[in-house]
Amino acid sequence: MKCLWISLLLVLGGLNVACSDTSEEAVSIFAASSLIEVLPDLLSSYEEESGVDITIVYGGSNHLGAQIKDGAPIDLYLTADIELLDPRIERVDELIFASNYITLAVPVGSEKNISSITDLTRVGLDIAVCAKEVPCGKAAEELGVVIAADTYEPSVRSVISRLTLGEVDLGVVYATDTISEPRITSVWPENPMCPCVDYHGVSFTSRGSEIAVHLVSEESREILTQYGFLSP
């Protein structure tokens, strides 16, 4: 993107904002925090070719859905849980552009002998998961074990932060996170499996719909694959 910056807005429950420099047309996108690494690459060519000025707000899908319900003016919403968006809100179009799955992650160099889903129940481990109100937490609940969690985080980015800072031994994150963050590694599963999440692009304007279509292009598919996302 032409001039990317990210800041933390505590008043919005830990949302991140990224924007480019001023141009003729402003476009606003709300995006799940798990897209924070890949989305700039996905949008760079579109932004350059169209000349639009894109502002992205990253956060937990529950917080973003609430902002939209309260009337936040946006063009496109990229969510990891479509059920968190009020179905009564009018929209122009909707599509699925990617999928992801959850994985157990540990800090690189961990000596805790963590290797399977049963370790989520181990006494003596410090474990971080997302709160059940956000997609990564909802998916973690579908693993079918009672997780001995020590902390419930507002977004998957918060779980990653706990892991990289060495504050926890084990975290439940998305598979893509272990690819983009070199300080953590996946220990389970070995191959993609559910619980899975689908990323929906919900457009509220014609420009938002155009960007959503760009996200399912062959160019975008190649970028998503590089970051570890699956085809929907």
Regions found by a protein language model. Give the residues of each.
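Sec-dependent signal peptide recognition
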Residues: 2-8
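Exported/periplasmic ABC-transporter solute-binding proteins
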Residues: 19-49, 62, 66-70, 79-232
